[in-house]
Amino acid sequence: MNPKTPVIVGVGQVLNRSKDLEEAVEPILMMLDALDQAEKDSGVRLLSDVSSVRVIRGVWDYGDPAGYIAEKIGCDNAETIGTLFGGNQVQAVLNRSCLEILEGKQDLVVLTGAENGSSSARARKQGVQLASTVIEGTSDEIVGSQKPEHHAYEIARGIKQAIQVYPMYENAIRYARGESMDTHLARGSEL
């Protein structure tokens, strides 16, 4: 095996589904917790050896979350990368990370991101401001290209969210296959 073959050595996931806003956890703390879990999952101490910290953009106001994380995990000299918004960013950054490891440009990369959308929505409805760490600065690099998310035709009709678009895709697939609603539902459910 090529010694530069990229390998995922640890994973961590944090879920914060409490309905109590007092128990809401802000995204940067969830990211740090997930990285701690990933390090434990790997079975070795490795976070301080990270060469690049990569954070997927979320709905938060942090300037350089990757830099903040690098400092907290003890790899102050690590490259810091952020992304633009986009559902494809996790896969795009994972792909890039693997290629850079394979090419010898990176040794150990952490990839993280977090949202507290449910807590944020609940807080907005209740007129409550959730605690948020102020993180200034800018990552060494921001990856991704910001293209218009919606066509003018969609915008004119108020179609702005994935939950509004994907049903149209599903109906187009169903129609193209000549399937009834029941047949399409059964086929999709088997996937």
Features from the language model and the residues they span:
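Conserved "HGTGT" condensation-loop signature of ketosynthase/thiolase-family condensing enzymes
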Residues: M1-T83, L99-Q106, V110-L191
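Conserved phosphate-binding catalytic cores of ATP/NTP-utilizing and phosphoryl-transfer enzymes
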Residues: Q91-L99
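Blade-loop segments of beta-propeller domains
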Residues: G86
